Curated annotation (Swiss-Prot):
One of its GO terms (cellular component) is cytoplasm. It is an enzyme of class 5 (isomerase). Keywords: Amino-acid biosynthesis, Cytoplasm, Histidine biosynthesis, Isomerase. InterPro entries: Aldolase_TIM, His_biosynth, HisA_bact_arch, Isoase_HisA-like, Isoase_HisA-like_bact, RibuloseP-bd_barrel. This is 1-(5-phosphoribosyl)-5-[(5-phosphoribosylamino)methylideneamino] imidazole-4-carboxamide isomerase. It comes from Bacillus cereus (strain AH820). It catalyses: 1-(5-phospho-beta-D-ribosyl)-5-[(5-phospho-beta-D-ribosylamino)methylideneamino]imidazole-4-carboxamide = 5-[(5-phospho-1-deoxy-D-ribulos-1-ylimino)methylamino]-1-(5-phospho-beta-D-ribosyl)imidazole-4-carboxamide. GO terms for biological process: L-histidine biosynthetic process; L-tryptophan biosynthetic process.
Length: 239
């Protein structure tokens, strides 16, 4: 199982939100580059970055920070948030990003998504964020009428190889992942799944590993120290 320490960017800082609420923001580190270096130092093999400002604005607003992170670490970095054109995708790749995560565009601009997948194949990940089972977009501010399962099936037909699935109600809560929704997703599509939201303990990670989930994104648990990064990396390596 792959472990993805998370860095959420807002106004150039590393923050955490609670259940996706921008008003419930906690600054975890004023210097996201330093945070990325810390994660790498403790053994992280890859990083997950979300441009929260970009997710709302529809364009990357923390590109300079992302570029500095990519230059500061030697591990692969995947980035999501506000990526809604091929130009935006190419710009991120040009500054050193390894993979990009498309969310809103996956629902509302299938032509762009198909072009991106055709050009960059496994480098394109789709992020599916669900609120009560329905897909949320534009920084989780809007909720659509399409279920997360239906969107995942559409993504599979297009050729998407990896999905990041987030249950928004779990995000930032340390309440444990939504195992039921993940199990249903696993039964519905044959795509690699990265679980996000609510992971609070080594036991949570072990449960997801036992389910053969490809990867897990860990945010608040690392910052609050309910999960030790070195320990979880060792545990998943042995599984």
């Amino acid at each position: 199982m792959e472990i993805f320490p998370a860095i959420d960017l807002k106004e150039g800082r590393c923050v955490r939100l609670y259940q996706g609420e921008f008003s419930k923001e906690t600054v975890m580190n004023e210097d996201p580059v330093a945070q990325a270096i810390i994660f790498e130092k403790f053994g992280a093999k890859r990083l997950h970055i979300v441009d929260l400002d970009g997710a709302v604005a529809g364009e990357s607003l923390n590109l300079s920070v992302i570029e500095r992170i990519c230059k500061a670490v030697r591990i692969p970095v995947q980035v999501g948030g506000g990526i809604r054109s091929l130009v935006a995708v190419e710009k991120l790749f040009s500054v050193g990003v390894d993979k990009v995560i498309l969310g809103t565009a996956a629902l509302y601009d299938k032509t762009f998504l198909e072009e991106a997948v055709l050009l960059y194949k496994e480098k394109i990940i789709v992020g599916i964020d669900a609120k009560n089972g329905f897909v949320a977009t534009r920084g989780w501010l809007d909720v659509s009428e399409i279920s997360y399962i239906d969107l995942a099936k559409q993504m599979e037909k297009i050729g998407v190889q990896t999905i990041v699935f987030t249950d928004i109600s779990k995000d930032g809560t340390l309440g444990g992942p939504n195992v039921e929704q993940l199990e249903l997703l696993q039964k519905s599509v044959a795509i690699r799944l990265i679980a996000s939201g609510g992971v609070a303990s080594i036991q949570d990670v072990k449960k997801l590993n036992d389910m053969n989930i490809y990867g897990v994104i860990i945010g608040k648990a690392l910052y609050e120290k309910t999960i030790d990064l070195e320990e979880v990396l060792e545990v998943t390596k042995l599984c």
